[in-house]
Design a protein with these regions (language model features):
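Long, contiguous binding/interaction regions
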Residues: 1-98
Length: 98
């Protein structure tokens, strides 16, 4: 089975723990080489975050465990890249013109 190389998640998280702490915990997981967390919306109690993880063998179940233990929930899996290498999206006719 191919290994997950990149995982992009839409997550709803409380303000605590901070994104710094969450990124540190996620980056400590085996198979994870890099973590990026961006907050794109915030209200009084929660933050909406885009979490991107890259590595040579990202384990979704372990990632989910860290996220849930932090009090957050995964809204959606927005991108998955698996296989021997990472490929970027290719532009298609369905993509809007910019």
């Amino acid at each position: 089975m191919g290994k997950i190389r990149r995982l992009v998640l839409d997550v709803l998280k409380p303000h605590d723990p901070s994104i710094i702490r969450l990124a540190e915990e996620l980056s400590d997981l085996p198979g994870v080489e890099a973590v990026n967390i961006s907050i794109y919306e915030m209200d009084q109690r929660v933050e909406n975050a885009k979490i991107t993880l890259e590595g040579d063998d990202v384990n979704y179940d372990e990632v989910l465990k860290v996220i849930v233990e932090s009090g957050a929930t995964v809204h959606s899996i927005d991108e998955v890249v698996a296989g021997r290498m990472i490929i970027e999206d290719a532009e298609t006719l369905q993509d809007p013109l910019v």
